Each structure stands twice: as C-alpha cells, then as structure tokens.
Amino acid sequence: GGYVSIRYHHSSFKQLVRDFFQVKQAPLNYLLVLIFIGLDFLPLVLSGKMIIPTWYLPIILFVKALVFGGIEEIGWRYFFQPTLQEKLPYLVSTLCTFVAWSLWHLFYFYIDGSLTTIHLLPFLLGLLSNCFILSAIYTRTRSLWLCVMTHALINSLSQLSSAESVWLSLVIKVLIILLAMRIASSSVEKSKS
C-alpha cells in the first residue's frame, strides 16, 4: 500500500513516515477517536467482559497492534478509500473498502490458519463498523496517524474482551455507522465549499 500510495500521490517515503507518526493533532480530533472507541467498546464495558490480567498488557498489545495492524491503514485509509472517493460518494467508497478489507482479512485468517476460530458474522459486522469509524476519522481529519492509532486501539482492546451483549452491540454498531456517515458528510460538504 505504501509504495502504491507514494507513486500515485507523487510523494516520498519520508512524507509517508512523517504522516504515519504525525501525533500532533487538534485535541478535537483525538476526542473524535475517543468517542468512537468509547461507543465501539461500550457493550463490553457495560457487560464487565473486559479482561486485563496485568496493567502492562494493554500497552504491549497496543504497540504490537500499531506495527502489525495500524500499518494496514497506509493502504486502506491513506490510499484506497480516498482514491475511491475521488470518483464515488463516501458511502459507496466505504462499502467498497469494507468488501476489500473483509476479503483481505479472510485471506489472512485462512493463511494464518485461524479462519475456523472466527465467528464470521459478528466479525464482519465489527469490521463494517470499524471501516466506517476509520473512514470518518480520515475524511474528517486527513490524518493517517489517527487512523493508525485507532486501528491499533481497536485491535488491542478486542484482545482484552471475551463476550458482549449481541443486541446492544448491534445497536451500537448501527449508531456508529450513522454517526460516521454524518461526520463524513459534513466534512465532505465543508471541503467542497
């Protein structure tokens, strides 16, 4: 994703690395991330199903997820979806990104050998809402770093959870998608004017 993005945008590796680690962001952008993460994990928090055996485990999981999960955002939110949005509306671009991202994950799990342990429908619903979270964040902020960080938070917090209320989770995912669409559409309108 990085190489294609650099070529397409006539950029450089140095600029890509700078964007990847651009932690200096407006506080409201970080608040947006916290709102989405809070909503995404609300069913787990309310059910008391977050498992944190040691204080340092979330930090280790976050750093691991930053390297192995967050790096995906170079391809998905930094290149693929914005390129689609040059020709397609936000909703269609996000759904196309979701389909591609789903296939990528399913192939990865197949190669990894963990496909049989995945509960497919809940995983895909979570991936759909996460796709909307990340696309809204990027559309609103144009920050690769915020997408990388959010992806890493989602991956690491997901590893600290065991079960959640299915119905509450479904309602929250719908709310997340609606909120993401609202944020993205207002951002697209602002950029046009």
Tell me the role of every PLM-derived stretch.
Residues 119-174:
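Functionally important transmembrane alpha-helices
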